[in-house]
Amino acid sequence: MEFYPVAIEKLIEEFAKLPGVGYKTAQRLTMHVLNLPKEEVEGFADALKKARGTIKYCSVCGNYTDTDPCAICSNPNRDKSLVCVVEEPKDIISMEKVREFNGVYHVLHGVISPMLGKGPDSIKLRELVSRMNGKVKEVIVATNPNVDGEATAMYISKILKPLGVKVTRIAHGIPVGGDLEYADEVTLAKALEGRREI
């Protein structure tokens, strides 16, 4: 039994394809869009089309960009000898917000995940290796601290160390303001492993 006209059902289905959006949220988004003034809906649709039509991947790092190379890769003030490897373009935004990293990035566009059938050839590892031109001194692996992220980090270390590149991993552990009693064993172990002198 259909509750909505076909056009509304189709819009709900399209919204539900977005990550983290279930059917109920897709319904709410659809109803919100239908209640917007026509000009706002057209502006939203135009912005989607323009972004999809003009945004591409940087040929150097794989980040989203409207110029090639991207603003980070083409910035002469960035340290090109320091490359931070991340899983997705959104991870670059997280790193940049910290304002502590002045190197460049490499986006893998995924991780090695045997459970999902994703091997090393499924992500941008060849491109990473091709960037090791003698000028890169250190690669910081900033994949997520889960099984797939750790497996990917270990694989990157294995393929880059023979090239004479220093490979480091971002530290993991207790968040600032966190209590030890609420930390799980793996987090505590990582915090101990990543300890440093004060």
Swiss-Prot record:
Keywords: DNA damage, DNA recombination, DNA repair, Metal-binding, Zinc, Zinc-finger
InterPro entries, per database record: DNA_Rcmb_RecR, Rcmb_RecR, Rcmb_RecR_Znf, TOPRIM_dom, TOPRIM_RecR
Coiled-coil annotated residue ranges, if any: none
Alphabetized CDD domains for the sequence: TOPRIM_recR (cd01025)
Entry annotated with the keyword Metal-binding: yes
An individual GO BP term: DNA repair
Domain Toprim, chain residue ranges per copy: 81-175
Molecular functions per Gene Ontology: DNA binding; zinc ion binding
Tagged with keyword Cell membrane: no
Superkingdom assignment: Bacteria
Zinc finger (C4-type) residue numbers: 58-73
Its biological purpose: May play a role in DNA repair. It seems to be involved in an RecBC-independent recombinational process of DNA repair. It may act with RecF and RecO.
Family: Belongs to the RecR family.
Protein name: Recombination protein RecR
Gene transcribed to yield this protein: recR
